[in-house]
């Protein structure tokens, strides 16, 4: 209910450098606890400027990622509440209207993330199969608000940084101008967040299932 309420009622729209929407209080206290406590491997990472380390890192980082799937859903009950919000017709209609994309027959992908010292993301575009990208932040370690996502214009000039505020988030549609990344910055302990996508490829969670 928290994510649904945030998308429907606690949302602000922006157009620079591309259309995006910021969310306030999208997570319940229980969901914050679940995201904070889920075990995410601290094995060495390549930190090649991609999340999966598929540009010179042999994809090693991708093998350490934690997605909400059927085989671990019983351990992540509050993540399942988010799935229900994301399947809600009011939510789907609201997101579709904003991003101007048809979500019919799409799937939901949810990832639990703990970015640690050395992590960064080069400016990139999402693959077209990602119809929408949403990031939800928790800042329980009082990290710098500058650790939010960086948005760029077509000249790769940094235009805006979404603040890394506790219990906040944003979303946007994939496109040919939605350049985003994370500059090399100091992460003192952890940058915990959750990435949510509506995608065209199959996952455990079809919106109609």
Residue ranges, per PLM feature:
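Non-heme Fe(II)/2-oxoglutarate
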Residues: 2-3, 8-98
